Amino acid sequence: MTNIRKSHPLLKIVNSSFIDLPAPSSISAWWNFGSLLGVCLALQILTGLFLAMHYTSDTTTAFTSVTHICRDVNYGWMLRYLHANGASMFFICLYLHVGRGLYYGSYLYKETWNMGVILLFAVMATAFMGYVLPWGQMSFWGATVITNLLSAIPYIGTNLVEWIWGGFSVDKATLTRFFAFHFLLPFIISAMVMVHLLFLHETGSNNPTGIPSNADMIPFHPYYTIKDILGLFMMITALLALVLFAPDMLGDPDNYMPANPLNTPPHIKPEWYFLFAYAILRSIPNKLGGVLALVASILILIIIPLLHTSKQRSMTFRPISQCLFWLLAADLLTLTWIGGQPVEHPYVIIGQLASILYFLIIIVLMPLIGLMENHLLKW
C-alpha cells in the first residue's frame, strides 16, 4: 500500500517539498536562512494578527492603543516586542540569505532569484508601513520624508504623493491605508514565497561548490529538518534575548513621543535595516538623483546574473572574488553606520565614497575580477 504522504493530493505536495525532497549532501549552514525566513514570516503574521485585534488605525488613538497593548493586554508587551524585533530578525536573515546567494552564485537560477528580489521589495514596503503605525514622532516624520521622495518624479510627482497621502499631508487617511496594506501584504508575501519555492524546486538547490550535485543527493528529512531546527533554536534564543532583555535597543527613543506635525525631530532616520539605503539616498545632493540611487541600490540585484563573467559558479575557489565580496559586506556595514549619523563632516564624504564603492564593486569590479580569474586559470 502506498504511504498516505505520497498519495494524498495535498500531503504529496508537502512531501515533495519538505520530506522526500532530494537535497545536495554538502549544503552548509548558510542554507538554513530560507527556512528561518519562513518561520519569521509565520511569527510576524501571528503576532501581527493579535496586535491588530487591539490596535486602532486612527491618528487620535493609534499611539494610545499601542501603549494600551503594552500596559493592559495580557502579554501585550511581549507581542509588541516580538513583532518589532521579529522584523529585525527577518531582515538579518534576509540579508544573510541574499549574501549567500551572491557568494555561491545561486543567482544563476534566474526565476528563483528574481522572485526573491521582488519578495525583498515587498518585505521592505511592509516593514516601512509597519513602522508608521505606532504614530510616534519617528513614525510620522519617517512616513513624511520617505513618501515625499516620490515628489521628485517629474511631472506626476506631486500628484502621486498627495494621492498616496490621501490629502495634503500625512494624516488620518494615510495611517488607515498604511494599516490596511500592512495587514494585507504579508499574505501576498506568503503566496509569493510559494512561487519562490516552486521555482527553486524546478532546479533543486545549489551547493557550496557550485558544481551540479545530481549524483550525490540526500532526502531533506531527517537530515536538513534537524539541521534547520538547530538554526531555528539559535534564532529564537537571540530573538527572546532581545525581547526580554533589551526590547528597545534597536528602536528609536523619539518614537515614544506622540506624532507632532509642528515639531521636527533633530535627526530623522529609518529603522536600522534601511540605513544603508538611506545613506545612499543622502549621499547625492539632488533629490531625483538620490531617489534613483536609492531604488538602484536594491534593484541592482536584478541584473547580477547578467554581470556574472566567471566560468565558475561559486566563489568557493575564487579567492580574489572572495576579497571583493567581503569588501562589499564591509562597505554595507559602513553605509549602515553612516545612515544613522547626522549630515555633517566627515560623515557626508564617507557616505559618498561608500556609495560609489558599493556600485563600483557590483557593476565594474566583480565582472572584471571574474574575467581575470578565468584568465589566471587559462580558461
From Swiss-Prot:
Residues binding heme b b562, per UniProt: 83, 182
Cofactor note: Binds 2 heme b groups non-covalently.
Keywords, comma-separated and alphabetical: Electron transport, Heme, Iron, Membrane, Metal-binding, Mitochondrion, Mitochondrion inner membrane, Respiratory chain, Transmembrane, Transmembrane helix, Transport, Ubiquinone
Any one GO BP annotation for this protein: mitochondrial electron transport, ubiquinol to cytochrome c
List of residues binding a ubiquinone: 201
Molecular function as annotated in GO: metal ion binding; ubiquinol-cytochrome-c reductase activity
Lineage top rank: taxon: Eukaryota
Keyword Iron: yes
Reported function: Component of the ubiquinol-cytochrome c reductase complex (complex III or cytochrome b-c1 complex) that is part of the mitochondrial respiratory chain. The b-c1 complex mediates electron transfer from ubiquinol to cytochrome c. Contributes to the generation of a proton gradient across the mitochondrial membrane that is then used for ATP synthesis.
Additional comment: Heme 1 (or BL or b562) is low-potential and absorbs at about 562 nm, and heme 2 (or BH or b566) is high-potential and absorbs at about 566 nm.
The protein's name: Cytochrome b
Lineage: Eukaryota, Metazoa, Chordata, Craniata, Vertebrata
